[in-house]
Amino acid sequence: MKLLISIEYRTRWGEQLVMRIGKRRIALQYADGGVWTGAIERYTQSEDTEYRYEIERDGACIRSEWRPHTLRLPAREGVRTLRIRDRWQEMPSDTSFYSSAFTRGIFGRGKTGSPKKATGNITLRVVLPTLRPDETLAVAGSGRELGDWKRIVPMDDSRFPEWELTLHTAHRFEYKFLIADRKTLTPILWEEGANRTWGELPGAGEHALDAAASPRFPKRRWRGAGTAIPVFSLRTEEDFGVGEFYDLKRLIDWAAATGQRVIQVLPINDTTMTGTWEDSYPYNANSTFALHPQFIRLPAAGVVEDDEYRTLRSELNALPEIDYERVNGHKLRLLRRAFERHGARTAARRDYKAFIAANRHWLIPYAAFCTLRDETGTPDFTRWGGFARYDRKTVDAYCRSHSRDIAFHCYVQYHLHTQLSEVCAYARDHGIVLKGDLPIGISRTSVDAWLYPHLFHMDSQAGAPPDAFSAVGQNWGFPTYNWERMARDGYAWWRARMAKMAEYFDAFRIDHILGFFRIWEIPTHAVHGLLGYFNPALPYSADELRGMGFDTQGGRYTTPAPDEHTLGELFGDLAGEVRATCMKEGRLLPAYATQRKVAARFPGDDEHQTRLREGLMALLDDVLFIEDPRRKGYFHPRIAPHSTHAYRRLDGERRATFDRLYTDFFYHRHNRFWQESALRKLPVLLSATEMLTCGEDLGMIPDSVPETMHELQILSLEIQRMPKTPGELFADPAHYPYFSVCTTSTHDMNPLRAWWEEDRELTARFYHEALGIGGDVPYFCEPWICRRILDMHLNSPAMLTILPLQDWLSTDGELRYPDPAKERINVPSIPRYHWRYRMHLPLEELLRKETFNESLHDMIACSGRR
């Protein structure tokens, strides 16, 4: 078949438009009026094929389309020539609607069957993702085929968001696109502007495809609501002491009943390290690919529902919170038993073999990691002797000698994948979007760090500067990314990670999106985030600092140099002991020179050791500059230095100089630098899948972050208690941007009711200023107050209002949990927090609360969300 291509594109002098299809490069020829044409004389590919247009200058690609086209040959026999009229696909201003959250979820068409086999001689093809499932794109026009404007002809949406209509005509005709009711074909909205005209008709043996049309409809601003809750926090009558993947089905039912469209969860990867409750932290996965065994529904994985099972399930489900150790211990024991019974039969199944083949690259190393972890009693692979460094041949031999254990872990992951895939399909069938969470870090004792240590800075820790959550900053302990090494293979690890996530989710939250601009990196010898610095960064050279009056030679300004006043403030009556045992000539002895050494020296919880430990930690924080560990002689100003003794000891002129260099460093020096850093990474990662991308952009935000998120159309996160406008105490939801996610709190914050009791003075200001209510402030956050706050958020312009389940329940005096303090999921200021919150009533009971559910449905509908 011969292909004749034409496309309109206004190039600049010296630019060349080319078509890339398969391995071919077709240089198009410039005609008149900005039109480029080209031909493929013999096209023999019968399957659908993707292609793109690119702009070249001097033989190099300088611009490419946002997404590919699909070439499909006409079904009609005898076609020898296909004429294609194309259009350049620029990134639209509403790319969110092109995500799978909309095309497969909210506006998804479900199982529409195979595309209609049309045998006409012309085809209209349009991409339009913003139509609801009860709507159809249609055409009306002149001529017999279109009923002389008296008929509404629906287009085929079996490849939604692509629409097609094939006609057979021998005459020119006029037409228009319109949106119609799917069932009745009653017109809802006609496109704007003059009628369209089909001019040149195809000749004998020809077929014409017009893919250049763009319907002229006003931009639609759909808004929806959703619920945020960790999977482990769900409760049903069928689970085993912890929320499970299958529990999401009941939550999906409830979301559909109340008019919600999104369910947002926390990370679901396996965090098993020690087998203790410390593994409950969902952001410390042992694999960024493997799913956590705690989420499995045991009977569906072959576990027999005998008396032992029923007794354990009853005991564990009766607990108000998760007993992490008992739940996971019993689950793994029962799964071992099921594997012994069903493992061989399962391994023979075709879908099991397909799962192994598709996931072998991470699954087998993960299974080996788990087996070695259990065998050695530690996830710290640096203590595994001959296995400390991953070697494929050595590990393959180990897997052969431990084949039963390897097969067991594969068996569990297969069932987890099967169950979650079933839930994912169930959500899409109900028009509900599952939104996942992409942690910014990986564990230093994980499969990923074991396999790919070159992709990470194992000598550093990721964290966050001081904020409302923690005065000394946060230290997450994760190694930071070696972006330079990752770039060498086009970020293959990230692309694989994203692709795996997209198997289950149609939207995701980038945890700490700032990490793609710059990460807060802390040396491994430090404990507090205060001793961190940004990476990448442009630290000051020693010469620059010297020119500003700060000579760092001899450790001045970079190591603590306390005077008597400082020691007295930090240690009180212990100052003499510190001076005598921990210091020499005004400096700390080497044994106390780092925070890790101090923590090891004073591990006790008694008052004496605690005071010494905390005082020495604070003393080590008391510096003005931190030397860059990879660039000796270059220095970062310490974050939040104004409360340090070192800052207070500066004279007035030097203090003013420091303030200027500090402000320049943190608020001006890096803006373009960090933006360029993010734009090298984020587009590659976002293009790896079709998921809707949302960013957690809270905290210390440089100007380049919202600019970049806007450019890449990543939804921002808006929280009333964490305003982004300087000087505001509370943000106004009425002023949130459309492309954003609006919520009352995150899992790191108190839900509404507990927050209400947190700071009475702040609550009073919120009551009077944000809610605009006079008089005495209620002591408790009464249901009517909660409802009013939720109404504010639902009526915001934000595309998505996703609220914690606790806050939805807070609007009902009978359904809300008696103790608001028990509803908190995490306290970031506590490094090893026990994550064990579970909703207090089963979802089956919540589904039966018809009056409550109808009230939520009405509240959501009245806000215009659907």
Language-model region placement:
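Aromatic-rich carbohydrate-binding modules that target alpha-glucans
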Residues: K2-D48, E56-R76, T123-R172, A180-G203, ...
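Tryptophan-centered motif/residue detector
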Residues: W36, D58-S64, R76, I84-Q89, ...
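Catalytic cores of glycan-processing enzymes that make or break glycosidic bonds
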Residues: Y98-K116, T123, P202-R866
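Low-complexity, Pro/Ser/Thr- and charge-rich linker/hinge segments at domain boundaries
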Residues: R72-Q89, W198-K219
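A short, polar/charged loop/turn motif at coil->beta-strand junctions and beta-hairpin connectors
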Residues: W13, A118, P133, W149, ...
